[in-house]
Structures are given as C-alpha cells and as structure tokens.
C-alpha cells in the first residue's frame, strides 16, 4: 500500500547554499512521525517544500500516490494539508470560536449571493460549520474559552487553538512545526494528551520538535536531519541508541 505522504530525494538550494540534500521520507495513514535535528538542519525548509511555500531544486513529493511537487500552497491545502507554524498565527482580536470558523471558509460551497441573502444553503453551511468548530474546541479543551479573544489566551492554549484551526480543514495530514516550543511542563503534557486523542482518531501527523521527551513519547518513527541530510530513521528506541544521532544532536539536546 502506498504511503499517505512520500518525499522522494528532495534537494533544496538557495543560491550557493544547499539546505536539503536527497531527503527521503514517508508517512503512512494514522502514523505520527517526527523530524528532529539541530537548528539549521533543514527541518522547516522541508515543511515549506511539502506545503508548497518553496519549490524543491530537485526531487518529488506525493500525497496518496498523486504528485504534488510545485503545486501552489492553496491547492496543496485543499488536498487535505493542515499546518501550524513556529510562530503562532491567530486573529488576535477575534474570539476563539471565530478563529476556528474563519479557518473553515475555504471549505464552504456557498456563493456570495448565498451569503448576502442568507439562503437556506448558507444557513445550512453555517450550522454545520458551527457544530464542527464547537466539536474541535472540545477536542482541544478550549470550549470554556470559546468567546474569549484569542490574544487573551495563555501561550499553551494559543498553541492548541492553532491546532484546532488546522484541523478545521478536514485534513488528511497534519504538520506540526515545533508545537511544544516555549511551553512549560504542564502545557506540554496537556498538548501531549491532545495529540494522543488525535492518534486515537487515526489522524496522520508529521511533526518537528526539539522536546525529546515529547517526541519519544508520541512518535512511532523518527527521522533525524543534520546539515540537510537524513542521517538516521527508525523507532524512538532505535534513534535514542544510534551513536551518530547522539553525536550530532541528542547530546546537544540534553544539554539545552
């Protein structure tokens, strides 16, 4: 069976700088896969290529067996990609609930006419979107805060709201870019429980993360990047005992 996501020998150059060299990875349906490595290893560049923000210098990317290399970001998102970023991107002066509803806009079918005259079709879609948004806020434990401004939420809850916004796209693959960055221990544990819920729902996740405890607890497989190359891949147990990984990254991560 073909992988849900397949990255085949991707190289990315910026002028004379090579950010990625022959990177290959795959993610199967329902898996949680991690990408780790030192700062500057090329992790976010890889995510940017997968989601269409960058074009690879060479290599190919497939989703469900269909090539998506060089498709624009909005077309890739429409195929079922949801993504969070290192820097939180929310509508600060909108409510938590409205932040999720806005994220659903690209999936609605109502026309401008429907919206202006509030036709039965528009009312039906509004009702469906509201029900889905409320479901997602319960999933990420933000139901009680649904009418609060996004900017009023503590950092950890803003991260969870960003995940809810990504999930609003009815995605086939969720990409999380350092979801636990900047969180305290309690916030990280709460996030871990939410990701476990997503796993139980058969959500497929590819994530970048520096918190090794988080990665080892939630990922089924891990790829390790160093200087733009995959130097190892395997289960958490295999990665934690790989001497090349320890030398390149894990020893540094433990010191931080």
Annotated model-derived regions:
Residues 2-256:
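Glycine-rich phosphate-binding loops of nucleotide-dependent enzymes
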């Amino acid at each position: 069976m073909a992988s849900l996501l397949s990255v085949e020998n991707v190289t990315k150059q910026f002028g004379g700088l090579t950010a990625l060299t022959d990177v290959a990875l795959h993610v199967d349906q329902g898996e949680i896969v991690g990408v780790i490595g030192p700062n500057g290893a090329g992790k976010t560049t890889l995510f940017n290529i997968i989601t269409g923000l960058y074009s690879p210098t060479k290599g190919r990317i497939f989703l469900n067996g269909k090539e998506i290399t060089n498709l624009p970001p909005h077309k890739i998102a429409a195929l079922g990609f949801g993504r969070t970023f290192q820097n939180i991107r929310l509508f600060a002066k909108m409510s938590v609930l409205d932040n999720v509803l806005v994220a659903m806009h690209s999936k609605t079918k109502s026309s401008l006419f429907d919206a202006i005259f509030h036709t039965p079709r528009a009312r039906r879609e509004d009702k469906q979107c509201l029900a889905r948004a409320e479901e997602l806020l319960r999933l990420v434990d933000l139901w009680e805060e649904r009418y609060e401004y996004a900017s009023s939420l503590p950092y950890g809850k803003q991260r969870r709201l960003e995940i809810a916004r990504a999930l609003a796209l009815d995605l086939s693959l969720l990409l999380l870019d350092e979801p636990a960055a900047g969180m305290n221990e309690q916030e990280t544990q709460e996030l871990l429980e939410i990701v476990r819920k997503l796993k139980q729902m058969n959500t497929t996740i590819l994530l970048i993360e520096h918190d090794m405890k988080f990665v080892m607890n939630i990922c089924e497989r891990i790829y390790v990047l160093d200087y733009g190359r995959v130097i190892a891949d395997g289960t958490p147990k295999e990665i934690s005992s790989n001497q090349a990984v320890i030398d390149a990254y894990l020893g540094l991560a433990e010191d931080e």
